[in-house]
Amino acid sequence: MSYLPNGAIVLPAGEGRPIPGDGLLIPNLVGKVTADQGSGSIAAMEGTAEPGFGPPIHIHHSSEELFYVLQGQMDFQIGDQRVSATPGTLVMVPRGTAHAPRVVGRERARFLVMFAPAGPDGLFYEIAALAQENGGAINDNDSRIEALTAKYDTEHVGPPLQ
């Protein structure tokens, strides 16, 4: 990673801070720009997830979340609407809106996910650390998950999409 004098960040392909997925709440992610880099105004991660993966319906109360599908197909529940996204599709979820993605079809999905302002990206790192403490898996009924989501002004409000 290169930090330029004007605050710009240049991150070559294949670089970033890995976040191992737990198969339940988070996909495999690589942090490209995190809350502790730059001004904290944006966080960006590259993700991959297998068909069927999708977190519970949730709300980020303090950040917008943006998804850009690079490969595969994903469905999104955004409020009371369900949309399908294929490569090249951008989905922007306003702060305070209940939403959830789900990988559909037979192909692994690859996507970018961004938060503005940065902040909720820290939740992924902390859940990954918790999963690692538990041998790589996590129970979505674990009370620590609720505490972590609250710490990052995020709230689970429904089950994963089917």
Range-by-range predicted roles:
Residues 62-74, 79:
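Glycine- and acidic-residue-biased ligand/ion/polar-headgroup-sensing regions
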Residues 1-42, 135-162:
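A short, N-terminal "cap"/entry segment at the start of jelly-roll beta-barrel domains
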Residues 38, 75, 95-121:
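Ligand-binding loop in jelly-roll beta-barrel domains
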Residues 12, 73, 80-98:
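Short acidic-glycine-tyrosine-enriched beta hairpin
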Residues 36, 53, 61, 73-74, ...:
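Hydrophobic small-molecule pocket/channel-lining residues, especially in calycin-type beta-barrels
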Residues 30-31, 45-60:
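Conserved short histidine dyad/triad with adjacent acidic residue
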Residues 107-150:
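A contiguous, mid-protein "functional segment" used to position or interact
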Residues 41, 65-68, 123-126:
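Residue-level recognition of specific faces of alpha-helices
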